[in-house]
């Protein structure tokens, strides 16, 4: 039985061209990214804000991965729901090259883990304060087609939740795997950088202006 994620939408146009899936972090919900979407101020876009399907152990919010390191992790609902969401977006008329994923913290982890398993490339990934949690599984499951998906990694130098070293490690893994990546560091803690909204806007409008091709 397929799983549907609770999802809100926000559009900046009656005929949007680009679709952006905004993936909240740990304990977040489908409302936390809307203000960020408005600050990015992207024309001709439709935003999709899904809610993570699992509750945190403390029951204070939502999580994309259920369980823990000792008992094991559950993520079937997450990947099933994300697959259904991206398929609906494509069926509604968006080309894969105009679909972007943006995620923060645990949401950035999911954006990378999910998008790079797809049997096709998408417009791009923006991973803020992210990391690769399941490295061995990622290295095994990442598809050749997904290496054409440009990636913008962003990480605060003073991040005390997910250290910037995790962002650097993620960058190194992706580059070694053949992905085109730009790693942007900024002076902040564990937060979405308001001063980098223009960079995100520019990346979504033209990823090649940020992520340079190797050829």
Model-derived features: positions:
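Short beta-strand/loop motif that positions the catalytic acidic residue
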Residues: 152-155, 159
